[in-house]
Amino acid sequence: MSWQAYVDEHLMCEIEGHHLTSAAIVGHDGAVWAQSTAFPQFKTEEMTNIMKDFDEPGFLAPTGLFLGPTKYMVIQGEPGAVIRGKKGSGGITVKKTGQALVIGIYDEPMTPGQCNMVVERLGDYLLEQGM
């Protein structure tokens, strides 16, 4: 299965009539492996800061998580494994695997829990596959 198929079929799938706004699978180096059409353009520095928060949990808390034009307030995640952010009625979930970051961005009517489930389920699967 191609990386694009993982994004299209596993991240952008419909859940209870809703789906993510955008999603991507990005290497630890910031290289995009696959993304949905609406995924924001981001700076390498933004991916570097996300990776730093996985190594040093809490790194992003004072400044927020920036991805493209959006700043998310970092909320409770799982240190070293999952970063979650909130902005208004939407947010972001980032799951770290051995080689990649699985990223999902949502807005209402999708809920934070639905986003977490979709992103973390694929991330856990990739971890099980040695990715």
Swiss-Prot record:
This is Profilin-9. It is found in: Cytoplasm, Cytoskeleton. A motif (Involved in PIP2 interaction) lies at residues 81-97. Phosphorylated by MAP kinases. InterPro entries: PFN (IPR048278), PFN_euk (IPR005455), PFN_sf (IPR036140), Profilin_CS (IPR027310). Signal peptide: none annotated. One of its GO terms (cellular component) is cytoskeleton. GO terms for biological process: nuclear migration; regulation of actin cytoskeleton organization. The variability of the residues taking part of IgE-binding epitopes might be responsible of the difference in cross-reactivity among olive pollen cultivars, and between distantly related pollen species, leading to a variable range of allergy reactions among atopic patients. Disulfide bonds join C13-C115.
